[in-house]
Amino acid sequence: MALVGAYAHAQAIIETLKGAGLVVGDGEAPRPAGRSEIITPCVVVHMIDGGMVDGTLADPDEWVDARFQITAVGRVAAEARDIADKASAALAGGVTVAGRRVMRVQPIDPWGRVERDNDVTPPVYYSTQLWRLFSFPEAP
């Protein structure tokens, strides 16, 4: 019996988004080497608090209900919405976690509002969406 780690789940989400042709940041916006501006458009993945683990008497922590946030970033509001829609479509197509079966990837808050971030140069627009991913061990 062991808790299921977040690494494999986070990597599966990131790889799914990259597989859809999106530029993806892991916990922070991607930036060109040695430069400060954000690569746009892009998506940033954050594993967040919440969710739960459950299971059987034999392995009480084998089922995972993980929560994560997708932040879509664009140069204009419409681009942020477009990237958010592309990320949603990629996730709806399914996520593969090594050694696990993913029952569902579900939006919790599918239409995040778009906001302008003036704290970066040049300013960008971003939209956040909350998601959950439910997985359990593959059958032997």
Predicted feature residues:
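Charge-dense, low-complexity intrinsically disordered segments
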Residues: 3-4, 74, 118-121
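Acidic-leaning, charged glycine-interspersed low-complexity segments
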Residues: 89-140
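Residue-level signal for beta-strand positions within conserved beta-sheet cores that form or flank
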Residues: 41, 66, 101
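Small/polar-rich, solvent-exposed N-terminal microdomains that initiate assembly or binding
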Residues: 1-58, 78, 82, 98
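Oligomerization/assembly interface segments of phage tail-like spikes and tubes
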Residues: 62-80, 87, 123-136
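Short, surface-exposed linear patches
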Residues: 51, 65-69, 90-95
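Short, solvent-exposed beta-strand/turn "edge" segments of beta-rich domains on protein surfaces
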Residues: 57-61, 119-122
